[in-house]
Amino acid sequence: MSQISSQTHAISINPATGEQNGHYAFESAAALDAALTRAAFAFGKWKRKPLQDRSRLLTALAGALRETSEAMATMITQEMGKPIAQARGEIEKCAKLCEWYAEHGPAMLDAEATQVEGGKARIEYRPLGPILAVMPWNFPIWQVLRGAVPTLIAGNTYVLKHAPNVMGSAYLLRDAFVRAGFPEGVFEVINVTPEGVSTAIADPRIAAVTLTGSVRAGMAIGAQAGAALKKCVLELGGSDPFIVLNDADLDEAVHAAVVGRYQNSGQVCAAAKRLIIEEGVVEEFTRKFVEATRQLKVGDPLNADTYIGPMARFDLRDELDQQVRDTLEEGATLLLGGRKAEGAGNFYEPTVLADVTDRMTSFKQELFGPVASIITARDAAHAVALANDSDFGLTATIYTANVALAEQLTSELETGGVFINGYSASDPRVTFGGVKKSGFGRELSHFGVREFCNAQTVWLDRK
């Protein structure tokens, strides 16, 4: 039996203590069929519900999230180890997401009219149907709602298959939808095995698929969706570059790098993983970064002042530790941490690796935990070349006083997002997604609303 599942149950283990939170029986084929039936039936009514009514329900969902914020945040912390202050912030961010789409989402579905020869034409955005969402554990509520809210405002229904170790969070979220007054079937939660996921993807009632997860999971889900000729959106990993040029404000850059690397105990897809520092400031940046990292409090994630909690699973900690060991054997310098913390729980010491080169493990692979890799660049052009020398392309950050230069460099960076003098973040006002092995498709902004829509051309009076 693994830490997160057996043949019959999804198992939730507290990563700070090793104690079991609970276990959740995998659903039968009949239960899965019933969930898909509810989602398909609900779609027929939900797509016809006036937009103002959908908006009203999203506003109610924001209220339901806030009403149980403490219970949901505590569940997140107990299931995957997120420090409680960050878990509370996740719930509030989700509430604001609901409110933002309640206000702005309907306009994103307005028809686009145009004059054409011999008549008039317009493009209408029609929902596709029930969307299957396979979601990860690192942001148990935000990752779900980031995709679900724009998908729902568009008129689709949503079937969530969550990670096995955060099923408690999934059920609390489902309860919030019920309290907000959403009709049955609009937001479904299924607890199934990988075989159950395959069954759902192949089922004709599922119109499309979205996944946030690993490259391996993305390839598997993408292949199955392709075999069924169904659209899919994949938000996969990232090994994001964080570029600091010689003229940058180092104090600001260091602060952003620390937050960008160590929030959520380093378990973030869009995070400052490869710190690419121009050689004129690499020594000073490194000194300040190590000192700032040393000040971070590691400990019980239920304590409000803890910044770094445990990693979500012991197997992930073992994998990270091996990546660090491999990088050190390849010639990197260990400046801080570099080992599993002693005692109970899946803790890993905040780690800083210096003298990392493009041939080393921590440069080539994604390190999903509290480990920063410092790489030296000769100049801005070399920094961009290093940034692009990756299988991933999620986000990138540039710190420099020369904003005009940064704007120029953005066109050279092979990523879905670029942040100038600020660390990467997801926000409903702008789209989110990657290129290369970071996936394809987009979430958030109007792109997220229309991602699972049929852009239908309506042509009138064509002669």
Name each model-derived stretch:
Residues Q7-A10, A272, L394:
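Short loop/turn microsegments at loop-to-beta-strand junctions
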Residues N14-H23, I206, I243, K297, ...:
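Conserved C-terminal structural/oligomerization subdomain of aldehyde/semialdehyde dehydrogenase
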Residues G18, R54, I76, C98, ...:
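Residue-level signal for inorganic ion chemistry
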Residues R216-T357, I420:
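ALDH superfamily catalytic-core signature
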Residues T157-V159, L334, G417:
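A short hydrophobic/small-residue beta-strand
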Residues M1-K120:
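N-terminal Rossmann-like NAD(P)+-binding subdomain of aldehyde/semialdehyde dehydrogenases
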Residues Q20-E27, A42-R48, A133, F242-V244, ...:
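Short, well-ordered beta-strand elements within core beta-sheets of diverse protein domains
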Residues D110, T114-E252, A377:
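Rossmann-like NAD(P) dinucleotide-binding subdomain of oxidoreductase/dehydrogenase enzymes
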